[in-house]
């Protein structure tokens, strides 16, 4: 079980994370290097040393961002891809085994509220389709999850560049990228794990190509090797009513292509609105127990984190990344796994 940590500026300390039963690994990254630059080996080594001094392990990076010029397929992408490959080598040399990344144009995860109040008084991240439909990014209006490093005119120019990039072009650019980096990842002993689009649908006319079962199947076929794998995020994919997360885990888990599991719950409305809930199955639209069983049945040996959490018990900090609810989620997931391991006598694929 792993836990995301945003470095020394994170209000959640490594000391507190270490106290969560069953949490052994930290998921982190180098946050002060510009996108597209090589992550220096000495910074990676220093991060690893900090984590290990706290009695935890560092084997998963989330994320190494992909420069927009690579997604756009611009002429300068080869230099940026070379930088990405060198970062993979540095991470592999430091003992990192999985790198999570995404291929979402312009915007990373998108939410319309960071602190929606739930019936129990806790607050959560939420997404409203109507709110997004009323927004024109060209007007300079921002939403949570957007890259704040873009000035309004820069964002407008970037969006203009994507007007000529449809799904087919984005697929071609992802294929070019994967064929360039996966052989290096294999040599470095690293598995790449692409994260689904969040939410799993086009927004603002931008193409999205990591949103459902067919997209995931196409991605793993582009370079058909275990080093080209998935971060299967139940919350991101589960926000799309068409996605059967349990079935996705069974299919791609049986293939050995899920290297990183983000397990969290969401409550999804018929119109596509959703809010992030407690991990417990009854709190949201996903059967978390069935999802965890699917991982168990397919012999999953990768990395897991509870992903996001609500803000509870008066905690403040980075929305979605407080200590308390994520800790509850980690313990809940570990409890499900322990029960399956001890009492489910159905052989897993790993023992058949």
Curated annotation (Swiss-Prot):
Q: Supply the SUPFAM superfamilies for this chain.
A: Xylose isomerase-like
KW Chaperone (keyword) present: no
Reaction(s) catalysed by this chain's protein: D-mannonate = 2-dehydro-3-deoxy-D-gluconate + H2O
Q: Which pathway, metabolic or otherwise, does it act in? A: Carbohydrate metabolism; pentose and glucuronate interconversion
- Keywords, alphabetical: Iron, Lyase, Manganese
Its EC number(s):
4.2.1.8
InterPro entries documented for this protein: Man_deHydtase, Xyl_isomerase-like_sf
One GO BP annotation here? D-glucuronate catabolic process
GO molecular-function terms, A-Z: ferrous iron binding; manganese ion binding; mannonate dehydratase activity
Q: What does this protein do?
A: Catalyzes the dehydration of D-mannonate.
- Family membership: Belongs to the mannonate dehydratase family.
Q: Can you name this protein? A: Mannonate dehydratase
**Gene (name only):** uxuA
């Amino acid at each position: 079980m792993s836990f995301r940590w945003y470095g020394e500026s994170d209000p959640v300390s490594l000391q507190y994370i270490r106290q969560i039963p069953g949490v052994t690994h930290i998921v982190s990254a180098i946050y002060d290097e510009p996108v597209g630059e090589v992550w220096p080996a000495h910074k990676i080594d220093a991060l690893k040393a900090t984590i290990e001094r706290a009695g935890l392990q560092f084997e998963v990076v989330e994320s190494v961002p992909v420069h927009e010029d690579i997604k756009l397929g611009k002429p300068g992408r080869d230099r940026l891809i070379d930088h990405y490959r060198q970062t993979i080598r540095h991470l592999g040399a430091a003992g990192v085994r999985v790198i999570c990344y995404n291929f979402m144009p312009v915007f990373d995860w998108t939410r319309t509220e960071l602190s929606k109040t739930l019936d129990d008084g806790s607050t959560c991240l939420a997404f409203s389709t109507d709110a997004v439909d009323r927004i024109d990014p060209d007007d300079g209006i921002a939403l949570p999850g957007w890259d704040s490093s873009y000035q309004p005119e820069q964002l407008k120019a970037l969006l203009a560049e994507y007007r000529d990039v449809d799904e087919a072009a984005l697929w071609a650019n992802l294929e070019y990228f994967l064929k360039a980096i996966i052989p290096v990842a294999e040599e470095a002993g690293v598995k790449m794990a692409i994260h689904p689009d969040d939410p799993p649908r086009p927004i603002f006319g931008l193409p999205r190509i990591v949103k459902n079962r067919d997209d995931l199947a196409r991605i793993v076929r582009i370079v058909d090797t275990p080093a080209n794998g998935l971060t299967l995020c139940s919350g991101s994919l589960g926000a799309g009513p068409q996605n059967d997360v349990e079935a996705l885990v069974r299919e791609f888990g049986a293939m050995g292509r899920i290297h990183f599991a983000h397990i969290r719950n969401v409550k999804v409305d018929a119109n596509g609105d959703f809010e992030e809930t407690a991990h417990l199955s009854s709190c949201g639209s996903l059967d978390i127990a069935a999802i965890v069983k699917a991982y168990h049945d397919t012999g999953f040996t990768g990395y897991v984190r509870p992903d996001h959490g609500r803000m509870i018990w008066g905690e403040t900090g980075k929305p979605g990344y407080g200590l308390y609810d994520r800790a509850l989620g980690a313990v809940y997931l570990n409890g499900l796994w322990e029960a399956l391991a001890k009492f489910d006598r159905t052989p897993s694929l790993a023992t058949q």
